[in-house]
């Protein structure tokens, strides 16, 4: 009976050692997973910063060009407004006189399709 008790004790100790080894392995695995996750996060952050820097650099070059385009468009708009304004003042009297002549010099005529019925 003592040998059975001793055998049971050995089995319990072996089971405890196996359980301890499993727990230790789980801890190491979790530690490696956390470390891998932290490294991946650091790599992702570094990549994101690099891409954002590239984007800002490209955006600055494009926006600089767009800023120049906006200035050119504004200048062209001012020139066209001045051109239209001078054209308006140049032809205003003549056009106004033509409109008044058409309004005052009415020549009443019957339409060609009009049929007079008595």
Swiss-Prot record:
Residues 1-12 have a biased composition (Polar residues). Subunit of the V1 complex of vacuolar(H+)-ATPase (V-ATPase), a multisubunit enzyme composed of a peripheral complex (V1) that hydrolyzes ATP and a membrane integral complex (V0) that translocates protons. V-ATPase is responsible for acidifying and maintaining the pH of intracellular compartments and in some cell types, is targeted to the plasma membrane, where it is responsible for acidifying the extracellular environment. This is V-type proton ATPase subunit G 3. Belongs to the V-ATPase G subunit family. It comes from Xenopus tropicalis (Western clawed frog). PANTHER family: V-TYPE PROTON ATPASE SUBUNIT G 3, VACUOLAR ATP SYNTHASE SUBUNIT G. The keyword Aminoacyl-tRNA synthetase does not apply. The keyword Coiled coil applies. Residues 14-26 have a biased composition (Basic and acidic residues). Keywords: Coiled coil, Hydrogen ion transport, Ion transport, Transport. One of its GO terms (cellular component) is vacuolar proton-transporting V-type ATPase complex. Residues 1-37 are annotated as: Disordered. GO terms for molecular function: proton-transporting ATPase activity, rotational mechanism. Pfam families: V-ATPase_G. V-ATPase is a heteromultimeric enzyme made up of two complexes: the ATP-hydrolytic V1 complex and the proton translocation V0 complex. The V1 complex consists of three catalytic AB heterodimers that form a heterohexamer, three peripheral stalks each consisting of EG heterodimers, one central rotor including subunits D and F, and the regulatory subunits C and H. The proton translocation complex V0 consists of the proton transport subunit a, a ring of proteolipid subunits c9c'', rotary subunit d, subunits e and f, and two accessory subunits. Residues 3-53 form a coiled coil.
């Amino acid at each position: 009976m003592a040998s059975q008790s001793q055998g049971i004790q050995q089995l319990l100790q072996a089971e405890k050692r196996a359980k301890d080894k499993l727990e230790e392995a789980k801890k190491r695995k979790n530690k490696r997973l956390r470390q891998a996750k932290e490294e991946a996060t650091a790599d992702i952050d570094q990549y994101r910063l690099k891409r954002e820097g590239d984007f800002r650099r490209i955006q600055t070059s494009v926006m600089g060009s767009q800023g120049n385009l906006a200035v050119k468009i504004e200048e062209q708009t001012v020139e066209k407004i001045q051109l239209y304004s001078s054209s308006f003042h140049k032809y205003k009297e003549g056009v106004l006189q033509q409109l008044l002549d058409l309004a005052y010099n009415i020549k009443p005529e019957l339409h060609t399709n009009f049929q007079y019925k008595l």
